[in-house]
UniProtKB/Swiss-Prot annotation:
Compartment list: Periplasm
Family matches, as Pfam families: NANM
InterPro entries, per the entry: Kelch-typ_b-propeller, NANM, NanM_proteobact
Family per record: Belongs to the NanM family.
Catalysed reactions, semicolon-separated: N-acetyl-alpha-neuraminate = N-acetyl-beta-neuraminate
Membrane-spanning segments: none
Species: Shigella boydii serotype 4 (strain Sb227)
Xref: PANTHER family: LD33804P
Gene3D superfamilies: Kelch-type beta propeller
Gene name of the record: nanM
Name of protein: N-acetylneuraminate epimerase
Keyword Isomerase set for record: yes
GO molecular-function terms, A-Z: racemase and epimerase activity, acting on carbohydrates and derivatives
Amino acid sequence: MNKTITALAIMMASFAANASVLPETPVPFKSGTGAIDNDTVYIGLGSAGTAWYKLDTQAKDKKWTALAAFPGGPRDQATSAFIDGNLYVFGGIGKNREGLTQVFNDVHKYNPKTNSWVKLMSHAPMGMAGHVTFVHNGKAYVTGGVNQNIFNGYFEDLNEAGKDSTAVDKINAYYFDKKAEDYFFNKFLLSFDPSTQQWSYAGESPWYGTAGAAVVNKGDKTWLINGEAKPGLRTDAVFELDFTGNNLKWNKLAPVSSPDGVAGGFAGISNDSLIFAGGAGFKGSRENYQHGKNYAHEGLKKSYSTDIHLWHNGKWDKSGELSQGRAYGVSLPWNNSLLIIGGETAGGKAVTDSVLISVKDNKVTVQN
């Protein structure tokens, strides 16, 4: 169905029969990753385990095709990008050989021509989970994400506690009851050159690192929207990275999803309009934190946003709504629109459908 809403006011929705954007994913899909290359969509990991699938969006009979399984084990929160015809997968959260949950800093490459994976002899200088990845001038850039040592230590402690609920409660209280700066989320910008498989320092945010931000780039500009400032506490901040000229500039734009912000939202561009949609967060957590409660989301219920915002004339306007709140899916550029694949809804339920958000003359169209 189609729902059209002006950028200035939410109008009555008009519904019409329409074909689905894409066929349903082979499995309910959330916390995975995806990329698009020459109109072919690739998705995998997350709730799909080690599975990967592709779909030719230009095919008359659109269907998902299974690819070679990912060799690095099941992972959540990995990122991926296409460079020169190859798919690169960065980090994620999964089990190590001892069965402990950990953050990875490795890189895998998939060759679509041979349907084969290889683990590269390359490791990022820090863990990659909750990070974002984008491509600029033939290189992959990574920023944001949790601190590998702190995160891994948390899960080591939980493993030691086992089924001792008292010990688990104590570990959680200790883990969440700290200020945002004490989690050392990554604020460095790293670049990965696929030709050399080397990582380099590319800059750092003058503010703070986030985890679970939405990312979108066009030309020399990249936007990082919302995300976690610490576990359980989101931010409404929007950062712009400007690669114009020889010097990278970091800018801070007007906030969105205020006051609490969201993580796991979706970002894209349609007809030069910057879009931000969905995401999940804890209403009231920002107020709790500002009043000195570091465990800001304790006792709060996670909520899922239906809001669609457009960046217009230097500010964000709520310009439409999703049919249901959604977060932690894959967002990709397709047909001059924002394509959302999968995600989770209330209660953490993984979904199989896709959503296409388009903008024309400041009007938002949502196709399910």
